[in-house]
Amino acid sequence: MPQELGLYPDLTALEFLDYMAVLKGITDRRGREQQIAELLERVRLADVAKRRLKTYSGGMKRRVGIAQALLGNPQVVIVDEPTSGLDPEERVRLRNLLGEVASRCTVILSTHIVEDISQSCRDLAVINKGQVAFQGGPGELIAQAQGKVWLVKTAGEKPDGATVVVSSMHLHDGTQYRVLGDLSAHPQATPAEPSLEDGYIWLMQGVVKE
């Protein structure tokens, strides 16, 4: 399923899925109708199946895309940036749907949204310039930044020794930075537990240097 879906705006979800099923070679009409009805239930669009696609929200269109991808019961489904641009509620709904799909087939998620990976994936790979820079579980990627994450409060200047500033928060008496690097000697540095994002950033720092 691509990030930008090529839907036909004047078709209903029912008509669109029927058309795509025919293109996929599902020629038995009764079997096609049954499969489409089941998929619409799974993606929670059965009650709006006869509405034109141009009236759907972005999240609803993504769910139509997933239903289309599942036509014909594929063994592998690839989704590209599935939650990009969605509001938090629809993002959670779509992640849960992909989790349900993953119980029936292999789902490959291509995304830059770290939260989607941490919530949905047990195995992951980091691709850099066409090469696999990392392959393993989320915990293994997080471990890349173990001992490298620090919280530092300053008057506003970036703390010395910080390789990367991950985030900064302005407070009433200064600025708190979350940084990656070796700040063990910094008097105001407090060690913090690494996140998946920290692990990814630290990994890529090493990859770029190489």
Predicted features along the sequence, with ranges:
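ABC transporter nucleotide-binding domain
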Residues: 93-179
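Conserved ABC ATPase "signature" region
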Residues: 18, 22, 30-48
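Conserved ABC ATPase signature
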Residues: 52-56
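Conserved catalytic motifs of ABC-family nucleotide-binding domains
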Residues: 73
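Hydrophobic anchor residue at the start of the ABC signature
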Residues: 66
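Catalytic Walker B motif of ABC-type/P-loop ATPase nucleotide-binding domains
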Residues: 77-81
